[in-house]
Each structure stands twice: as structure tokens, then as C-alpha cells.
């Protein structure tokens, strides 16, 4: 029942929220948000298990699939979309599914999250296989859409994780790995787009970023597989080459073009004094890891 969930409780600090000044509201929201990272810290060992599982799936050619309803679903779609330009992966490698489909990203779709079968159907549409990793996201921890999807994923042998913001969440029983970030009562009662949503976003950031490090998408702390889809990212790409190799802007630009705008390739060309094809071949041998390539 909803009344038994911490995310649905009334926050004693904000009982008279409508009487507070804007400054007072901002201060109490800031104070409440400060506890989110502490709640996440308690679950880091479980989040690490998810990262290890996702990385293993990627190495097998599998995909990461986020799945949720409402805010939770939107956060999964957002993180999946950001992985494409940030890490240069295809839009099929990290997928975000939301109950009700794409139109639910901007407006609510009545009844979509209450369907057990809809989650299963959405996974069937993307041809889920056992090498994929499915993460179900639900602040309440009880969304039928997510439960149905997790059950189907486990049925076909895919690894699963559940991320919720309540202790002993219902979805935890339907996943291999359970992350329960207990963020407590919201400033605005029941509005889980607030602390719960913030916690979920931070955890998804951790999972996608750390998993991408694990498959060679990062050199030092540089996004060397960035996809330069606009002028800003083109300039960032050149700055990354400069930072990684200690060359000037003109040299970085020259190798950037010679590498056909592949930052990682340009870096290896410079650091190993090699031509493009040789750099590509050596990167392939090192499974895409720049550090391993240049240390050979």
C-alpha cells in the first residue's frame, strides 16, 4: 500500500510549505537534497555489482536496457540518449524504455505503468537476449510495468537489477541485484521527481560512466570516444587531443582530421608516432583501450 512507503510519507520539516518564503523553501530543499548522496553511499557495493554485470554484457556484445514509468522512465531514456555523444556508442547499445512509449516522455499515458504485460512486450519489441542487462527503475518499488519486464528478462536468462527508493521494495524480489536508495519523505509529499529522482539520476550516471570506463571508452579522465555531433563537441574533441598528448591546437586539429574525427585514433597516432591504419589496428588488438595501446 502507498501509505506504507517512505516516499509517500509527509515530511515533518515542510508541513507548512505553503507558508514559507521562497528563500526558506529553497533552503529546506537544499538541506533535504544533501542527504541523497549519503543514501547512495550505503548502496555502493550493490551498484558495483550492477556495473560489473553491465560491463560483462557489453564485452559479450550485449546491451544495457533501462526501463521505468514516469520520472523513472524518463531518467533512463535521458541517460541512454546521453551515452551516444559522450561515449560514441550506437543508440542500440544503451536503450531507455518508458511505459507508454516515446509520447510518455513529455506527457502522462494513462494506465501504462499499471500493465504487467506491457513491460514484457516492450522488451520483446527490442528482441531482448540473454547477454543483455536490464535495469528496472521505480521510486516506489512497486510499478507493475517494471515487474513484468524484470520477470520476462529473468525468464530468458538476462541479468537484471532493480533500483528503488524504498526499503524492502516489491521489485527487489524480481531482480538479481537490488539497490534500495532510501531517500525518505519528499519536500512536496509524494513528489518522487525530487529526492528520489535525483538519487536515481546519480546512480544511472554512476552505472553508465563506470561501465563505459570498463570497456575502454575513457583514457585518463577524458572521453576519447566522444561523438562530435556539433561545433561545441568538435572543439571539445580537439581539446581532449591536446590534453592527452600535450600538443598545440594546430597539431591537434591536424591529427583530428587525419583520424577522420576519431579522437581516440588521433591520440594513439600522436603518442605512438603511427599512421591511422596502424593506430586503428593496435587499438583493436587492445580492445579499444588507449592506455594499453600506447604501453605496448
From Swiss-Prot:
Gene3D superfamilies: 1.10.8.1080, Glucose-6-phosphate isomerase like protein, domain 1. Belongs to the GCKR-like family. MurNAc-6-P etherase subfamily. It comes from Listeria welshimeri serovar 6b (strain ATCC 35897 / DSM 20650 / CCUG 15529 / CIP 8149 / NCTC 11857 / SLCC 5334 / V8). NCBIfam families: N-acetylmuramic acid 6-phosphate etherase, PRK05441.1, PRK12570.1. A lyase-type mechanism (elimination/hydration) is suggested for the cleavage of the lactyl ether bond of MurNAc 6-phosphate, with the formation of an alpha,beta-unsaturated aldehyde intermediate with (E)-stereochemistry, followed by the syn addition of water to give product. The keyword Transport does not apply. One of its GO terms (biological process) is N-acetylmuramic acid catabolic process. InterPro entries: Etherase_MurQ, Glucokinase_regulatory_CS, MURQ/GCKR, SIS_dom, SIS_dom_sf. Keywords: Carbohydrate metabolism, Lyase. Homodimer. It catalyses: N-acetyl-D-muramate 6-phosphate + H2O = N-acetyl-D-glucosamine 6-phosphate + (R)-lactate. This is N-acetylmuramic acid 6-phosphate etherase. SUPFAM superfamilies: SIS domain. It comes from the Bacteria. Residues 54-217 form the SIS domain. The keyword Lyase applies. Pathway: Amino-sugar metabolism; N-acetylmuramate degradation. Its EC number is 4.2.1.126. The active site is at residues 82, 113. GO terms for molecular function: carbohydrate derivative binding; carbon-oxygen lyase activity; ether hydrolase activity. Specifically catalyzes the cleavage of the D-lactyl ether substituent of MurNAc 6-phosphate, producing GlcNAc 6-phosphate and D-lactate.
Amino acid at each position: 500500500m502507498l501509505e506504507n512507503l517512505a516516499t509517500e510519507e509527509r515530511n515533518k520539516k515542510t508541513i507548512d510549505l505553503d507558508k514559507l518564503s521562497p528563500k526558506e523553501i529553497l533552503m529546506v530543499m537544499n538541506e533535504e537534497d544533501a542527504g541523497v548522496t549519503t543514501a547512495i553511499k550505503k548502496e555502493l557495493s550493490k551498484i558495483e555489482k550492477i556495473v560489473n554485470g553491465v560491463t560483462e554484457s557489453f564485452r559479450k556484445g550485449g546491451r544495457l536496457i533501462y526501463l521505468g514509468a514516469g520520472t523513472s522512465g524518463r531518467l533512463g531514456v535521458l541517460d541512454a540518449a546521453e551515452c551516444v555523444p559522450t561515449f560514441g556508442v550506437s543508440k542500440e547499445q544503451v536503450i531507455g524504455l518508458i511505459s507508454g512509449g516515446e509520447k510518455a516522455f513529455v506527457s502522462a499515458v494513462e494506465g501504462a505503468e499499471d500493465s504487467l504485460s506491457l513491460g514484457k512486450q516492450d522488451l520483446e519489441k527490442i528482441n531482448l537476449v540473454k547477454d543483455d542487462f536490464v535495469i528496472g527503475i521505480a521510486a516506489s518499488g512497486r510499478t507493475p510495468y517494471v515487474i513484468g519486464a524484470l520477470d520476462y528478462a529473468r525468464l530468458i536468462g538476462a541479468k537484471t537489477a532493480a533500483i528503488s527508493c524504498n526499503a524492502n521494495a516489491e521489485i527487489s524480489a524480481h531482480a538479481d541485484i537490488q539497490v534500495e536508495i532510501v531517500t525518505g519523505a519528499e519536500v512536496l509529499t509524494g513528489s518522487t521527481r525530487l529526492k528520489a529522482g535525483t538519487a536515481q539520476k546519480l546512480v544511472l550516471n554512476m552505472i553508465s560512466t563506470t561501465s563505459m570506463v570498463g570497456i575502454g571508452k575513457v583514457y585518463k579522465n577524458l572521453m576519447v570516444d566522444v561523438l562530435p555531433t556539433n561545433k561545441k563537441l568538435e572543439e571539445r574533441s580537439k581539446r581532449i587531443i591536446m590534453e592527452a598528448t600535450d600538443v598545440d591546437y594546430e597539431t591537434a586539429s591536424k591529427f583530428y582530421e587525419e583520424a577522420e574525427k576519431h579522437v581516440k585514433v588521433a591520440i594513439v597516432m600522436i603518442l605512438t608516432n603511427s599512421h591511422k591504419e596502424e593506430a586503428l589496428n593496435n587499438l583493436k588488438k587492445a580492445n579499444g583501450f588507449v592506455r594499453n595501446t600506447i604501453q605496448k
